[in-house]
């Protein structure tokens, strides 16, 4: 059985400002750096052997802090990027028009075909983050990988691991630098989560 640890990046400036990030980026706050240091301490205790991270800046920085403590290299994987929020990226959530808020709600509240213009669907997100998780099966026996990703991306991944639809992530709300664990059986196509 392979244990895969899932970590959301530390708090960013835009998290604090309630801005939509998606695949756009903002730096970690001092609090976010501290959160990553706390995860790094725990990751070292867990014996993490591989760190696989989204290639966006906020996850890169979180992964760098963890890798330094664990003595691991980082593998960057664009499949772990956040949901592409299209034309709403970089916007303050409180400044959305009624139409824009409806797009956002349709997407995150479970409309199967929900999509923000120029963005991606929850199913597209689910397909790519699940493929990234599956690639952990190719790591050497005894590996303890840690994936560093984003709130909606990880929520979507955990939802599908639990057998829920991709858009059920809304009910899971993973906090900045939270740690979740997925147990993946190497022989059967079966994944279980212990959250």
Spans of features found by a protein language model:
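Loop-to-helix element that buttresses phosphate recognition and phosphoryl-transfer chemistry
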Residues: 11-65, 116-130
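Short, basic/glycine-rich phosphate-binding loops at helix/coil junctions
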Residues: 19, 102-116
């Amino acid at each position: 059985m392979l244990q895969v640890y899932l970590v959301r990046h530390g708090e960013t400036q835009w998290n604090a400002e309630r801005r939509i990030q998606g695949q756009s980026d903002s730096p970690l706050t001092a609090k976010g750096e501290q959160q990553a240091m706390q995860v790094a301490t725990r990751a070292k205790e867990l014996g993490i052997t591989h760190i696989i991270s989204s290639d966006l800046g906020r996850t890169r920085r979180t992964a760098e802090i963890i890798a330094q403590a664990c003595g691991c290299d980082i593998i960057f994987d664009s499949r772990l990027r956040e949901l592409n929020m299209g034309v709403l990226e970089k916007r303050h959530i409180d400044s959305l028009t009624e139409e824009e808020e409806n797009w956002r709600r349709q997407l995150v509240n479970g409309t199967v075909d929900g999509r923000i213009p120029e963005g991606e669907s929850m199913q597209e997100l689910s397909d790519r983050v699940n493929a990234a998780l599956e690639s952990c099966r190719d790591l050497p026996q005894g590996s303890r990988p840690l994936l560093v990703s984003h709130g909606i991306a990880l929520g979507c991944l955990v939802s599908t691991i639990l057998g829920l639809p991709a858009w059920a992530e809304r009910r899971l709300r993973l906090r900045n630098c939270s740690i979740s664990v997925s147990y993946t059986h190497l022989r059967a196509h079966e994944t279980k989560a212990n959250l």
